[in-house]
Amino acid sequence: MPRAKSSVVSRNRHRKILKLAKGYRGSRSKLFRVANQAVMKGLFYAYRDRRQKKRDFRKLWIARINAATRMNGLSYSRFINGLKKAGVEVNRKMLADLAVNDAKAFGQLVELAKSKLA
């Protein structure tokens, strides 16, 4: 059986990595070993941050809701508790959007939560 050489496979693998590293600065887009490390790290960051993004946005929404509820004389946790008791099922994304774009409607929700807490 003849010896199988890996030149075609290696070249294709190198080409694939260097294509992924296109746009990187310096040797990170030119040299295979450095480019491979940069691409692997980039893919790791992308994977990790797709999950992190969900947590970051939830934190942002909670901070916005908290700021708006405190302007209306209520804390975030008591506001959420009041909404749960009132049976209002609006998610935090929508609450944050209301707090930023429609303060009047958000104020009505705060008053509803206050009435259910009292």
Swiss-Prot record:
- GO molecular function terms listed in the Swiss-Prot or TrEMBL record: rRNA binding; structural constituent of ribosome
Entry-linked CDD domains: Ribosomal_L20
Query: Which Gene Ontology terms describe the biological processes this protein takes part in?
Result: ribosomal large subunit assembly; translation
Q: Which UniProt keywords apply?
A: Ribonucleoprotein, Ribosomal protein, RNA-binding, rRNA-binding
GO cellular component term, pick one:
ribonucleoprotein complex
The answer, when asked if rRNA-binding is one of the entry's keywords, is yes
A Pfam family annotated for this chain is: Ribosomal_L20
Which purpose does this protein serve, as stated in its record?
Binds directly to 23S ribosomal RNA and is necessary for the in vitro assembly process of the 50S ribosomal subunit. It is not involved in the protein synthesizing functions of that subunit.
Q: Say which family it is in.
A: Belongs to the bacterial ribosomal protein bL20 family.
Q: Spell out the protein name for this chain.
A: Large ribosomal subunit protein bL20
Q: Which organism is it from?
A: Desulforamulus reducens (strain ATCC BAA-1160 / DSM 100696 / MI-1)
